């Protein structure tokens, strides 16, 4: 609860403050260290480390054993594997920043970052999405710096001397008269974080995502070291699986997929042609079956195998062929019904397509609406559909002769 105490018991959660510590406190985007504090019969599990008031380190965690009192002497044991993975990502972040500025322009400025053991995230100013080609070049440049195995040189110097040396400072960050400068290859930045000894220790750098955060701010995420290798291996497994499904090798996945998509488009065109022919054949029969009510031809029918588009085409064709007409067509699939209604000629103004489709849809558990001359709707398939379609001529008659 934030109150200072003189001691804690096993099972208590607390923030322990030490006069000095090997733990890194979260700062500059780099997450705080985890590990353990040990003393005589004392074991405190550190889940996070934060900087307090800019100078103290707060070790957050839980006392697993013993009684920890104010003034006790303890030793710290940092989770070395977690720190090592975090270090790779922090040094890679510096190389990434340099590659972004080198390729996209010096307007690129850091707007936020996360340096964690499992990944790195970098937010930066840029006016448009980074293209796939640009991302590939950025990744290539960073890996080139990794392979160059540059030594990472860390020095403390005066702020003006650092600026004269070309060091990049973070906008809005507060610095003292003495600053810590981290240089690796062409990258020179002010930084208080932990880093590799040489860039080659990063092993591999792999970009995994790019997107927008806000207006003028982009975000990239990346992996390094073993995490990057694991990601590449997973992508290769997926590629092999895709190749197997396509009946080819990883080298011809793109060609196989392109051929499959072209075949799908061709089949879709053939299906549309078949539907058009079916609609054309159906309309010829429906013209003969149209009912004449006060000089208006009325057609209400169910057509098998036609979707909403085919129903619209058939309705348009019937309106053209019948002149003054009221048409409502239904197509059923998987228990669902698509409805299209159309009105033309002298029926216009007296019959509204939206009202007609609403009448039919309402009887089959659905709804619909649209323009006075053309409307759409839907509902559930069942015996009620044929029954309501049979009532359409009388419904039209009541509208044409309301008295």
Predicted feature locations:
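A glycine- and charged-residue-rich anion-binding loop/surface
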Residues: 1-403
């Amino acid at each position: 609860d934030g109150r200072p105490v003189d001691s804690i018991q096993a099972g208590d959660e607390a923030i322990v403050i030490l006069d000095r510590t090997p733990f890194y406190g979260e700062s500059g985007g780099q997450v705080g260290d985890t590990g353990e504090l040990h003393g005589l019969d004392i074991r405190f599990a550190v889940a996070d480390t934060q900087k307090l008031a800019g100078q103290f380190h707060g070790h957050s965690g839980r006392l697993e054993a013993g009684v920890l009192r104010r003034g006790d002497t303890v030793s710290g044991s940092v989770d070395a594997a977690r720190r090592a993975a975090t270090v790779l990502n922090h040094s890679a972040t510096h190389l990434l920043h340099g590659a972004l500025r080198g390729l996209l322009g010096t307007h690129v400025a850091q707007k936020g970052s996360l340096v964690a053991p499992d990944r790195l995230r970098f937010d930066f100013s840029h006016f448009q999405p980074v293209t796939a080609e640009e991302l590939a070049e950025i990744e290539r440049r960073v890996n080139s710096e990794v392979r160059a195995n540059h030594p990472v040189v860390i020095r403390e110097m005066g702020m003006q001397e650092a600026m004269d040396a070309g060091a990049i400072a973070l906008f809005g960050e507060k610095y003292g008269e003495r600053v810590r400068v981290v240089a690796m290859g062409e990258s020179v930045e002010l930084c208080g974080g932990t880093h590799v000894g040489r860039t080659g220790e990063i092993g591999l750098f792999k970009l995994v995502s790019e997107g927008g955060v806000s207006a003028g701010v982009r975000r990239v995420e990346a992996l390094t070291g073993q995490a990057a290798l694991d990601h590449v291996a997973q992508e290769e497994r997926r590629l092999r699986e895709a190749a197997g499904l396509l009946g080819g090798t990883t080298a011809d996945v793109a060609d196989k997929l392109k051929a499959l998509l072209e075949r799908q488009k061709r089949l879709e065109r053939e299906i549309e042609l078949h539907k058009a022919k079916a609609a054309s054949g159906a309309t010829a029969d429906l013209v003969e079956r149209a009912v004449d009510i006060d000089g208006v031809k009325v057609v209400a029918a169910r057509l098998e195998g036609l979707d909403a588009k085919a129903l619209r085409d058939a309705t348009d064709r019937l309106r053209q062929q019948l002149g003054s007409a009221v048409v409502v067509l239904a197509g059923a699939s998987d228990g669902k019904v698509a409805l299209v209604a159309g009105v033309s000629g002298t029926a216009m103004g007296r019959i509204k397509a939206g009202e007609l489709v609403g009448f039919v849809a309402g009887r089959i558990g659905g709804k619909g609406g649209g323009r006075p001359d053309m409307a759409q709707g839907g509902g559930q398939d069942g015996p009620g559909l044929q029954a309501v379609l049979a009532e359409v001529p009388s419904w039209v008659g009541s509208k044409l002769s309301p008295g």
